[in-house]
A protein has these predicted regions:
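Conserved PLP phosphate-binding loop immediately N-terminal to the Schiff-base lysine helix
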Residues: 1-18
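Short, conserved loop/helix-junction motifs that constitute active-site signature segments
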Residues: 20-23
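PLP-dependent aminotransferase class I/II
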Residues: 26-79
Length: 79
């Protein structure tokens, strides 16, 4: 979860997890546009994962009603 990575002033990437050859088997990266672009309360984010992991996540999302409001989605696209 890299929700607060934009508040870290150290130079360079926050980690080297994606350099591990087996990252696709276990790693899911989460990011929050809500924090980075000050979209407080709009719950807009992104996920980076291997295609197989994303397919599993999509199965879950098909069973729950989760959606950021349109204002937050548009602000994230604009930001």
């Amino acid at each position: 979860d890299e929700t607060y990575r934009d508040f870290d002033s150290r130079p360079g990437p926050p980690h080297d997890l994606f350099t591990d050859p087996g990252w696709a088997d276990t790693l899911i990266q989460l990011y929050s546009f809500s924090k980075a672009y000050r979209l407080t309360g709009h719950r807009v984010g992104a996920m980076v994962a291997a295609p197989a992991r994303l397919a599993e996540v999509e199965k879950f999302l098909d069973t729950v009603a989760i959606c950021a409001g349109q204002i937050g989605q548009r602000a994230a696209l604009w930001g």
